[in-house]
C-alpha cells in the first residue's frame, strides 16, 4: 500500500509501436520499478501507436492523487521526441491539470547506463551461442 505522503509519481515514457509485443520490456521495467519504490505511483505512457498516451497516463496518475510527476524518458538519445514532442506534451498536461513535472535525462546521457549496457554487450557476446 502507498504511504500517506505519496503525492509524487513516476511516468515512464517510451515511443510506442504497432506491435503489441514491443511493449513487454517496458511493462517489466514498470513492475521492477514498482517493486523497488512502493512510495510512488508508477505509470507507463507511449508517444504513439499504443495506449496509454501521455495524457491518458497523466490522468491516471492524477486520479491516484499525484501532484508531481517525474518523467523518465526511455529513449537512448536526445532527438526530436525529447526536444519537441515531450515538452509540448508536458506543457499541455500542466495547463490541463496544474501538475508539476520534472524530466530525467535520456538514458544515454547517464554514464552509469552506458557502462551497464557496455557490460551487458560484452557479457552477452562472450557467451557460447
Q: Model segments located where?
A:
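Active-site-proximal alpha-helix that buttresses catalytic centers in soluble enzyme cores
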Residues: 1-129
Amino acid at each position: 500500500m502507498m504511504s500517506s505522503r505519496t503525492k509524487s509519481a513516476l511516468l515512464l515514457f517510451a515511443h510506442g509501436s504497432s506491435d503489441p509485443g514491443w511493449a513487454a520490456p517496458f511493462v517489466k521495467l514498470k513492475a521492477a520499478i514498482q517493486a523497488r519504490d512502493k512510495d510512488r505511483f508508477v505509470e507507463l505512457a507511449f508517444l504513439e501507436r499504443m495506449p496509454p498516451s501521455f495524457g491518458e497516463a497523466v490522468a491516471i496518475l492524477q486520479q491516484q492523487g499525484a501532484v508531481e510527476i517525474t518523467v523518465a524518458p526511455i529513449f537512448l538519445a536526445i532527438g526530436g521526441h525529447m526536444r519537441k514532442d515531450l515538452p509540448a506534451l508536458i506543457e499541455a498536461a500542466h495547463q490541463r491539470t496544474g501538475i508539476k513535472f520534472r524530466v530525467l535525462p535520456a538514458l544515454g546521457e547517464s554514464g552509469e547506463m552506458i557502462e551497464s549496457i557496455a557490460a551487458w554487450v560484452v557479457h552477452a557476446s562472450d557467451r557460447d551461442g
